[in-house]
Amino acid sequence: MDENYLAWERDYKVAAHRSWNAMLNHQEFMLLLRANKFEEIALRAVRIESRTNLIFSFEKMALRDAVRTKAGAAAFAHGLHDLVYGHGRDEDKFERWCDVVASLPRVKTRVLTWPIVTVFGFIALPRVHFFYKPTVTRVAAHMYGYPLHYVSRPSWQSYRHVLDFAALVRRDLSDLKPRDMIDIQSFLWVQGSAEYPD
């Protein structure tokens, strides 16, 4: 295994997933929900994400502002639980999550962005959810020859297209044995990001 890949791309994402499993696993999440500890749920989720470089600092601030109120934290906590642990079709859960994020209080910067909408599913369920940063992912898709359609407002229809692209990449990389969406997202990040030279 490439040590640079592990250090620069995979390890901190796996660490965030492990933190999620320790701090917001299903049982712990339910205990906090039943006790109406919405602010604690939001605090833990934001803290777990803050140890990564996944979302931009202005998005981190917008998210913290949005869950600062009890109402914002309650909506966030219930919506996040539904996304990660709820029953039903992924399509319905994702659309409800987008509606929740759209309803969160906005102080300065909008909260309804692709990175914010996809980061927590990715951290909690990296075998299922893809973390979508539109600019880098679109560059990677273009380089890959995949027609990734982009719509700025998050929706299941657009996310499904991103998941289809991730599934194609996973199949194409099957000889490398990608473990989860962390490997797929990291591969596409390296392809599309200016951080990595050709």
Where are these regions (language model features)?
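An N-terminal alpha-helical hairpin/helix-loop-helix interaction module that forms a charged
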Residues: 1-110, 126-198
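Contiguous, well-ordered alpha-helical segments that form the cores/surfaces of helical PPI scaffolds
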Residues: 117-125
